[in-house]
Amino acid sequence: MSLAPGTETDLQNRFRSHFCGRLNTEYENKQVRLAGWIHRKRDHGGLIFIDLRDHTGIAQLIIQPEKQELFQKVERLHVESVIAVQGTVVKRSEETLNSRIPSGAIEVLVDDVQVESHAVALPFPVADELQTSEELRLTYRFLDLRREKIHQNIVFRSQLISKVRRYLEDHGFMEIQTPILTASSPEGARDFLVPSRLHPGKFYALPQAPQQFKQLLMVSGFPRYFQIAPCFRDEDARADRSPGEFYQVDMEMAFIEQDDLFEILEGMLRYLTETMSTKRITQFPFPRLSYRDVMNRFGSDKPDLRVPLEMQDVTELFVGSSFKVFASNTKEGSCIKAMVLKGRGTESRQFYDKAEKRARELGAPGLAYVQYREEGPKGPIVKFLSEAELSALQERLAIETGDVVFFGAGKWEKTCKIMGGIREYFSDLFELDRDELSFCWIVDFPLYEFDEKESRIDFSHNPFSMPQGEMDALDTMNPLDILAYQYDIVCNGIELSSGAIRNHRPDIMYRAFEIAGYSKEEVDKRFGHMIEAFKMGAPPHGGIAPGLDRLVMILRDEHNIREVIAFPMNQQAQDLMMSAPSDVSRLQLRELHLKLDLPVETAEQEPG
């Protein structure tokens, strides 16, 4: 396990003089006091061997048969009982050396044992990391956290937070705490609401992010802010998203431009990677790719750049084609995308059927493909394509014999996303380097999008981002062509964070909202406190907030976010260990002036 904080001297007391994992041959013949949990216990012909575990690792103890009182005391103990011992460090014999643990060259001959806590039979073993159901692990999380792998994850997380603080403080940032009880916002995800006892009928909300507070700190004259910020969103769980709450490294800076922020965050991520991981960053500074570019090439705004697959636009090759499916998608707003899979042109029919099934799940009517075989092009659509079109495709896409090319056709955005999903589906065919961190910035997001359902223009992402070109762009450009100073940081297909250079000018803000159909009065009603603050002198500012949990996941090579959180909820947003959420009494509800209006199937569970 990872080393405990502090030194031996710092933590000496009646329980311990040393840590288990730090003992070595330098301590030979020295008296030591150790304390911890019984990891394993073995009786070998009258000798009892105990692997004693503390936060730093394991030390082997020996209870000799002549110590009858100690022998009987220890013999009755279950694993995971807590003991404090005193004894003498001795070298192990050559045949008993254990190179798998740092203390494997020594053992401790025990003179005294104090039993601090008796452990009952356990619901699952700690010493052997056997497959255990997640439900059981989360119910007994305090036990699960003793297991080496997850214990190290939490230690790593603590050390990473410490390094983040050090880096940001060295770069002029101040750590400032923002409120946990705040106002509900109609934007974004669903809020967690907290009823007010003192103000009947009114509610606080737990913050989805400290967004407005950190911007107001810039208005208050603090140049650089950060916080290891808890955020609360009532949303469903995913492998890389914890339901309910998560933590982010929340940052904001005044008097900066986009490049300044990129330099700070890239430096921090490189520092963390180099000091805490054996992984390597593929390219530094991180490449910057426009939203339009990544959608055209990868079909996703969070691409895994390790996957050696790219889409290419072949729309112009099929203008006037006799294949109507392609010809009808050569007009403005539509496209034909092609993606070559090298060396897969001779796969079985099942291979292509599975790929087509995935395409249908993504919303496509099917998945067209052409196999370039020794005997010539094959596949379901070959009969509809001319020899000239097949040759032009082969030349444009550098197709070789044995390759297969897949196609998507339709409206640009939908087609890109479907083909991006197919790219992700095929990524399992490649042996990706798990030690490679392929960071990139996604920039130049559109400020607006056209809402097909509402038949109107609306903001595509963050309405408070500064438009590129500022007021001039809003007054002179087609709204759908206006780009925002908004950016995402992505690593290996995982979005770590979104950020933006903020719109700090009320006149530009009113105009931006006007284009999206919001009146000045409506903007004032929704965001009046922010507008008022900006009217009193707001500096140019911007920020970002990388997800702490996701960052630890990436650096620790974990695929499940619950493996890097000490006490996570399950996928149904339940804390199985604390039995939350739980019923509350009628008295508690009455104090908050609340009555329950439960769905029929749960009404019988109303608290009595």
Curated annotation (Swiss-Prot):
Gene3D superfamilies: Bira Bifunctional Protein, Domain 2, GAD-like domain, Nucleic acid-binding proteins. One of its GO terms (biological process) is aspartyl-tRNA aminoacylation. One of its GO terms (molecular function) is ATP binding. ATP binds at residues 233-235, 495, 547-550. It catalyses: tRNA(Asx) + L-aspartate + ATP = L-aspartyl-tRNA(Asx) + AMP + diphosphate. L-aspartate binds at residues 187, 233, 461, 502. Transmembrane segments: none annotated. Coiled coil: none annotated. Its EC number is 6.1.1.23. Keywords: Aminoacyl-tRNA synthetase, ATP-binding, Cytoplasm, Ligase, Nucleotide-binding, Protein biosynthesis. Residues 211-214 are annotated as: Aspartate. It holds the Pfam family GAD. GO terms for cellular component: cytoplasm. The record marks 44 as: Important for tRNA non-discrimination. InterPro entries: Aa-tRNA-synt_II, aa-tRNA-synth_II, aa-tRNA-synth_II/BPL/LPL, Asp-tRNA-ligase_1, Asp-tRNA-ligase_1_N, Asp/Asn-tRNA-synth_IIb, AspRS_core, GAD-like_sf. It is found in: Cytoplasm. Aspartyl-tRNA synthetase with relaxed tRNA specificity since it is able to aspartylate not only its cognate tRNA(Asp) but also tRNA(Asn). Reaction proceeds in two steps: L-aspartate is first activated by ATP to form Asp-AMP and then transferred to the acceptor end of tRNA(Asp/Asn). Homodimer. Belongs to the class-II aminoacyl-tRNA synthetase family. Type 1 subfamily. This is Aspartate--tRNA(Asp/Asn) ligase. The lineage of its organism: Bacteria, Pseudomonadati, Chlorobiota, Chlorobiia, Chlorobiales. The gene is aspS.
